[in-house]
Amino acid sequence: GVPSFDDKLVQEVVRMVLEAIYEGHFEDTSHGFRPHRSCHTALNAVQKTFTGKKWFIEGDIKGFFDNVNHDILIDILKERISDERSIRLIRKFLKAGYLEQWQFHGTYSGMPQGGIISPILANIYLDKLDKYMKEYASKFDKGDRGRQQREYEVLTYQKRLVMRELKTATNN
């Protein structure tokens, strides 16, 4: 269902508080649903910092918002938020449920897509994955940069040959 004005107002205040608590602790590589960040800032970061790594991780967590485990999310929140009333309030938002054809449906997992606090809660939940992957990746990032692919080396060599031929042809 559509939240009332009062619910939206309370959610916005909770979102602002959560952002103040967590925003400075998210990984710099995280760009989704964050202030002053977008897919464009993510692409710019890749363009500026790419060093020929050996591997990438790309993912799309299908049905993410529908499948967030409430208990795990609450446990993550409790690591930084000790106020039990705040935790209860967030749990109430998660468990609010919805009305469909005048019948109430409880919510036992997931977050409402389009909910005011859903994006920040998603980032809090996925920050654990970001930190794990950063630590995991560091085990593979040895040396200055990864070895470039053979195809890239061949293309680079061919480009140099063509450039040399062009210089020779224009100088004659």
Annotated model-derived regions:
Residues 1-172:
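Non-catalytic terminal/accessory segments
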